Amino acid sequence: MPFGTEAAMERDKNQLISVPVKEQPQLPYLAAINPTGQKTLMEKLGILSDAAKYDVSCSSSGVGRKGDGTGIGNTVAGGICHSFGADGRCISLLKILFTNECIYDCKYCINRRSNDVPRASFTPDEICELTIQFYRRNYIEGLFLSSGILHNPDYTMELIYEAVYKLRTLYRFQGYIHVKAIPGANPLLVQRLGMLADRMSVNLELPTAEGLSRLAPNKHRKNILTPMRQIQRGITQNKEEIAVYRHASSFVPAGQSTQMIVGATPESDYQIMMVAENLYRKFELKRVYYSAFVSVNADKELPALPGGPPLLREHRLYQADWLLRFYGFEADELLSEQKPNFNVLLDPKADWALRHLELFPVEINRADYRMILRVPGIGVKSAQRIVRARKNGALAFEDLKKIGVTLKRALYFITCSGKMMYPTKIEEDYITRNLISNKEKLPFGADGMTYKQLSLFDDDMPGWQKIAGGTL
């Protein structure tokens, strides 16, 4: 039987939930979560949208889910962002936790069990109503749903599954849905959610198992990697089934992602990039997110951050990650055990080029695509345009500027028809000084944050304020 058939989903669902979800309008746990006299829906929304802001592992996915005309919603392959502004601007993704209750006591987490913070939990029906009502008002295009662990992983995943199942079936919502898989939950629940969600993610939390055991003693690396492997195999199997069964249901069509906290444990950039590279290779992840550690708890195991969160380090990791995914670099080309951390003054690509000046200057009219990609100041689109344009004749520096090459960075590393743009010394110190003088524009806001989830409620937020680092 195909992996993604409705019959398989119904069979697996009934093994865990004896009564079909659509026949369960009232369940015992709903009263336990929200008895009469507890928080209103708007109070819950305020608490649980704010609690979700530390999870950065969501943004646009590139997936398209075309509505079939029988329901509501349509996923456009792009433009899915973090949240929306109080002025009605579509930032487009309702990003909330199902609950910030949690049985775990992770030292770095604001929602840890021992913290005295306002607690709240949605019901599946409340999640559905919020999503639909926000969608109808054109505030969002989709839903990002994560959660603390309520009672146990299976219990939490069943609640999440019920919410997503109702959205897709009862409410006929066909927009984008990104769901967090809970480590340690029953694999059948992961499989069933994968048939309904566009993207799933399992947070790695910390780069190494040692760091995880020290700061999150209730979590285990194996429990995190198991659902990641299951999702990867499910995606591969689903692609094979769709090739044979044209109408087979899709399984996590936008792929999976993960997130690592940077700076909470002493791992080097080299260790972090090696972990990321292995995740891309072994688990075929679409994206690894890096979150600069923000100190929200007082704990002796957590590092002191007199300079604030390591935002520049996070930025360099994202730049290096881009080089791994789109520029053909490998982690051990960028860093090594002898040079374990990125240069804070130079981006990783320029730093690599300066350490390999024997390969430069590159002759633009003859170099292969791979080498052109490695020139600082030349991006993927510019490299593709160069390869196409030079078929029609030799390119000059004026042509490169029109193509989109950043010449103030590239001029030290390229020639056109054997000539450099200006007489330039191919010396590391000289080029470094000139590159540093061209101050790099870092994606930090006025408050030093690399990203910002807009409030659902603050009416005094300037309309021009933008989210930094919000594209995928």
Feature annotation, model-predicted:
Residues 1-101, 406, 414, 422-472:
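Flexible, acidic/Gly-rich N-terminal and inter-domain linker regions that tether
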Residues 93, 106, 145, 202, ...:
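Conserved, mostly hydrophobic/aromatic
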Residues 128, 151-334:
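Conserved AdoMet/S-adenosylmethionine-binding subsite of the radical SAM
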Residues 96-125:
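Canonical Radical SAM [4Fe-4S] cluster-binding loop centered on the CxxxCxxC motif
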Residues 132-147, 320:
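Short Fe-S-cluster ligation motifs
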Residues 301-373, 409-461:
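Long, highly charged, low-complexity intrinsically disordered interaction regions
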Residues 94-96, 125-136, 243-244:
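Short, charged beta->alpha transition segments
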